[in-house]
Amino acid sequence: MTTLPVQQLYIHGQRVDATSGKTFKTVNPATGEVIAEVQVASQADVERAVQSASEGQKVWAAMTAMERSRILRRAVEILRERNDELAHLETLDTGKALAETTTVDIVTGADVVEYYAGLATAIEGIQLPLRESSFFYTRREPLGVVAGIGAWNYPIQIAMWKSAPALAAGNAMVFKPSEVTPLTAIRLAEIYTEAGVPAGVFNVVQGPGREIGQWLTEHPVIEKISFTGGVATGKKVMASAASSSLKEVTMELGGKSPLVICDDADLDRAADIAVMANFFSSGQVCTNGTRVFVPRSMLAAFEAAVVERVKRIRIGDPMAAETNFGPLTSFPHMENVLRYIESGKAEGARLLTGGGRATEGALANGAYVLPTVFSDCRDDMTIVKEEIFGPVMSILAYDDEDEVVRRANDTTFGLAAGVVSKDISRAHRIIHRLEAGICWINTWGESPAEMPVGGYKESGVGRENGISTLGHYTRIKSVQVELGDYASVF
């Protein structure tokens, strides 16, 4: 039995039926029960969404920046008024603890919308004199219609991260949420409409990425793709975007991020950071610090401190106020994480805690995996090399700074990195040598609206959040003006 009615598409300011005649089911990962059936967009539906966006964008771009700013600020007010309602739906769909979704997902996403609402009026060009009778100026103009393709771990937050700068700059967006967690994107679209965003400026099309995502990346009207997901899919999106019409792309992809504990670090602080960097959101965070490098001299003490903290994690019904660790977001993903755990055991890593499903009582019905910590890990182990995207920490011993920097950088990923040390000069020195786009010293994981997010190497292209992102949703037009006579050479 489903909990919610059939979920439609959202095109031109209203919910509309898809024309494909197909649906898919979205499942509550805490119980295995179907939440809703979701309609799948056809190619004709995607075309309708793009054309609607093209029409709406012209209306939106013709407004003054101050008008757009006021409308986005009103959307922020509505988001905050409905925080608990949206958080409840997000928990139902993702399995994340309600204690997390009520304080992080909508709250921080709304912060990003508010941030870009404030910047909408600050988009400006330059003017420079060339000589007494001539000068040039530049204009930053919106790209037009852009597409956002979201991930399943932070559905509504990612939708806001992608749409806020796009809309602030005067663009329209066609957004495709993950088919694993599709429910809150339409609620966001309705809030934008209620706030006064013109019809068509934020449309939502549902369905599998291999179809909907491909149609969006190849569409000649779409000028930019913002994608969050895996590396392999990201490469396909980038190739498709380039082959169709040389679209600009922004990609936040995978990670296998190092957390370096220095020998002068406070043990309790280091253990607290390591546990947060691995088990927040049940380990389903792109920036997780899953490779924890610890000085050999403090390895035993660090292991004990981490295990002590893991035992305090409260696994349970994500709707319960006391729960701070819910199920993984889907059953197929749970099976994948369990395979990685078994590979860690088979390749000789020493299991300190966890190592399988949580099956006590009602937990057996959900996609629960115990917080898992391995030690005696080697750089060539599968659990150390590949992104697991689950609650699995790998502890690696090291002997000196040069060694740990070399090993930390020995990866195709470069999303995040962190250092824990009482010596701030030392921490800066190590951070500056690490090949990662998002770094933390003596903390982990916070991504404020003002801070650019993105990776090095195969972890991504471009950035989300921060001032510079706004520029990537505009294009520069240069205009020269001649005030004097024009002298032809002919």
Swiss-Prot record:
<keyword id="KW-0630">Potassium</keyword>
<feature type="binding site">
    <location>
        <position position="246"/>
    </location>
    <ligand>
        <name>K(+) 2</name>
    </ligand>
</feature>
<feature type="modified residue" description="Cysteine sulfenic acid (-SOH)">
    <location>
        <position position="286"/>
    </location>
</feature>
<dbReference type="InterPro" id="IPR015590">
    <property type="entry name" value="Aldehyde_DH_dom"/>
</dbReference>
<keyword id="KW-0520">NAD</keyword>
<dbReference type="InterPro" id="IPR016161">
    <property type="entry name" value="Ald_DH/histidinol_DH"/>
</dbReference>
<keyword id="KW-0521">NADP</keyword>
<feature type="site" description="Seems to be a necessary countercharge to the potassium cations">
    <location>
        <position position="248"/>
    </location>
</feature>
<feature type="binding site">
    <location>
        <position position="460"/>
    </location>
    <ligand>
        <name>K(+) 2</name>
    </ligand>
</feature>
<comment type="function">
    <text>Involved in the biosynthesis of the osmoprotectant glycine betaine. Catalyzes the irreversible oxidation of betaine aldehyde to the corresponding acid.</text>
</comment>
<feature type="binding site">
    <location>
        <begin position="150"/>
        <end position="152"/>
    </location>
    <ligand>
        <name>NAD(+)</name>
    </ligand>
</feature>
<feature type="binding site">
    <location>
        <position position="457"/>
    </location>
    <ligand>
        <name>K(+) 2</name>
    </ligand>
</feature>
<feature type="binding site">
    <location>
        <begin position="176"/>
        <end position="179"/>
    </location>
    <ligand>
        <name>NAD(+)</name>
    </ligand>
</feature>
<feature type="binding site">
    <location>
        <position position="387"/>
    </location>
    <ligand>
        <name>NAD(+)</name>
    </ligand>
</feature>
<feature type="binding site">
    <location>
        <position position="254"/>
    </location>
    <ligand>
        <name>NAD(+)</name>
    </ligand>
</feature>
<feature type="binding site">
    <location>
        <position position="93"/>
    </location>
    <ligand>
        <name>K(+) 1</name>
    </ligand>
</feature>
<feature type="active site" description="Charge relay system">
    <location>
        <position position="162"/>
    </location>
</feature>
<keyword id="KW-0558">Oxidation</keyword>
<comment type="similarity">
    <text>Belongs to the aldehyde dehydrogenase family.</text>
</comment>
<comment type="pathway">
    <text>Amine and polyamine biosynthesis; betaine biosynthesis via choline pathway; betaine from betaine aldehyde: step 1/1.</text>
</comment>
<feature type="active site" description="Charge relay system">
    <location>
        <position position="464"/>
    </location>
</feature>
<dbReference type="Pfam" id="PF00171">
    <property type="entry name" value="Aldedh"/>
</dbReference>
<feature type="active site" description="Nucleophile">
    <location>
        <position position="286"/>
    </location>
</feature>
<dbReference type="InterPro" id="IPR029510">
    <property type="entry name" value="Ald_DH_CS_GLU"/>
</dbReference>
<feature type="binding site">
    <location>
        <position position="180"/>
    </location>
    <ligand>
        <name>K(+) 1</name>
    </ligand>
</feature>
<dbReference type="GO" id="GO:0019285">
    <property type="term" value="P:glycine betaine biosynthetic process from choline"/>
</dbReference>
<protein>
    <recommendedName>
        <fullName>Betaine aldehyde dehydrogenase</fullName>
        <ecNumber>1.2.1.8</ecNumber>
    </recommendedName>
</protein>
<feature type="binding site">
    <location>
        <position position="26"/>
    </location>
    <ligand>
        <name>K(+) 1</name>
    </ligand>
</feature>
<feature type="binding site">
    <location>
        <begin position="230"/>
        <end position="233"/>
    </location>
    <ligand>
        <name>NAD(+)</name>
    </ligand>
</feature>
<dbReference type="InterPro" id="IPR016163">
    <property type="entry name" value="Ald_DH_C"/>
</dbReference>
<keyword id="KW-0479">Metal-binding</keyword>
<feature type="binding site" description="covalent">
    <location>
        <position position="286"/>
    </location>
    <ligand>
        <name>NAD(+)</name>
    </ligand>
</feature>
<dbReference type="InterPro" id="IPR011264">
    <property type="entry name" value="BADH"/>
</dbReference>
<keyword id="KW-0560">Oxidoreductase</keyword>
<feature type="active site" description="Proton acceptor">
    <location>
        <position position="252"/>
    </location>
</feature>
<dbReference type="GO" id="GO:0046872">
    <property type="term" value="F:metal ion binding"/>
</dbReference>
<dbReference type="InterPro" id="IPR016162">
    <property type="entry name" value="Ald_DH_N"/>
</dbReference>
<comment type="subunit">
    <text>Dimer of dimers.</text>
</comment>
<dbReference type="GO" id="GO:0008802">
    <property type="term" value="F:betaine-aldehyde dehydrogenase (NAD+) activity"/>
</dbReference>
<dbReference type="InterPro" id="IPR016160">
    <property type="entry name" value="Ald_DH_CS_CYS"/>
</dbReference>
